[in-house]
Amino acid sequence: MDRSLELFQIAKNLFPGGVNSPIRAAVKPYPFYVKKASGATLVTVDGVELIDYVLGYGPLILGHMHPKVLEAVEEQLNRGWLYGTPHELEIELAKKIVSHYPSIDMVRFVNSGTEATMTAIRLARGFTKKNKIIKFDGCYHGAHDSVLVKAGSAVSHFGVPGSAGVPEEVSKLTLVVPFNDVEAVEKVAKENQDDLAAIIVEPVMGNAGVIPPKEGFLKELRRIADETGALLIFDEVITGYRLGLGGAQAKFGVVPDLTTLGKIVGGGFPVGVVGGKREIMEYLTPSGPVFNAGTFNAHPVTMAAGLATINELERGYVYEVANSAAEKVAKALEQEAVAKFGGVVHRVASMFQWFPGVEEVNNYADALKANKEISLRLHEELLKRGVFIAPSLFEAWFTSAAHGEDVVNKTLEALSEALKVIS
């Protein structure tokens, strides 16, 4: 018995399903356990080296164990790792975010993307004094009650339409419409405008594969929000700092009222950010009536890692390397995978996905028609050949500054070999 299997047998008695996040159980026949990581490489407890295209599901845009991040974390640990008071690094990281996102005047640091979207929605409701929100079918905004309705991601992989334990009274306040369908958004928004607090959207869907917005779609959301008095919330937990320093809102030229960030902004440590216009943000406690608090908010180690990461991103080379790697692998998927099995490949900057067996994917319903079995087989065959991609087409491939030419060439060889044995 290998060590990963041995550990999983123990874990099944300790954790529901043997894991602490559902997607980790999707690796078959059982999850592998990681001992260490560096650059673009994971090393399992059994000594197997894997090129990593999951990167912690997005945060590690510099790759694993980047020396600048490691140095910053070590320096902070030597000064203490939890104060329960304000500290200088939270100011420095906030200043960076405000400088990169013109829509953001102020921020509140929290501890996860889930906390960020939960706080943003509560804030929108408190500010507008309205209750309903519009979300998009297949957009994932974390694991809290308001957004566990047609939520994509691991929910999709395991075939669960929502979640048990969410009261119907709560889910009724969440109105779900198809992504990229302006007409549907406008209809639902205007029918509910007297009680519509917010429209929340992943500007690029990243938890139903990778689905970009159609030309003008996000600008139409801005218009509809303005006309109905709702706040527009961009959930940039994935796209923030991945599509560029200014995220999706800079790329597509649309200014939201509130933005949520996470993943990259913590440099690989737990983090969430809510940011927006001053007059909205000041509704948060202690300056306003909308409650938010947290023992670990603006954790010093996270702030150090995030600041080091963003300092490195400002140098520019990270985006050049990561985007180039993504372009090459996505092109290979188009030339080899699509040629054999059909489908489409979507890439936005350094995130991409192949949807086998479908002609177009503009929304979650389209994504559900893709051949999940072929996608899972590719995951399995690449894993045998030393490449780790997410075990679900409802996730994305991610690249980093560590995915240089040698890493990409090894990936392309493994991809060609894997596709030959899939039928």
UniProtKB/Swiss-Prot annotation:
Statement: the UniProt record of this protein carries the keyword Isomerase:
yes
Which Pfam families would you find in this protein's record? Aminotran_3
**Pathway where it operates:** Porphyrin-containing compound metabolism; protoporphyrin-IX biosynthesis; 5-aminolevulinate from L-glutamyl-tRNA(Glu): step 2/2
Cellular component per GO, a single term: cytoplasm
Compartments annotated for it: namely: Cytoplasm
Which GO biological process entries does UniProt record here?
protoporphyrinogen IX biosynthetic process
- Top-rank lineage group of the source organism: Archaea
By what name is this protein known?
A: Glutamate-1-semialdehyde 2,1-aminomutase
Q: Where is the signal peptide?
A: none
* PROSITE patterns xrefs: AA_TRANSFER_CLASS_3
Record-stated family: Belongs to the class-III pyridoxal-phosphate-dependent aminotransferase family. HemL subfamily.
HAMAP family per UniProt: HemL_aminotrans_3
Alphabetical keyword list:
Cytoplasm, Isomerase, Porphyrin biosynthesis, Pyridoxal phosphate
This chain's source organism reads: Ignicoccus hospitalis (strain KIN4/I / DSM 18386 / JCM 14125)
Annotated PANTHER family: GLUTAMATE-1-SEMIALDEHYDE 2,1-AMINOMUTASE, GLUTAMATE-1-SEMIALDEHYDE 2,1-AMINOMUTASE 1, CHLOROPLASTIC-RELATED
Cofactor dependency: pyridoxal 5'-phosphate
Q: Name positions with the PTM N6-(pyridoxal phosphate)lysine.
A: K263
- Gene3D superfamilies with a match to the protein in the record: Aspartate Aminotransferase, domain 1, Type I PLP-dependent aspartate aminotransferase-like (Major domain)
| EC id | 5.4.3.8
Asked whether the UniProt record includes Isomerase among its keywords, one would answer yes
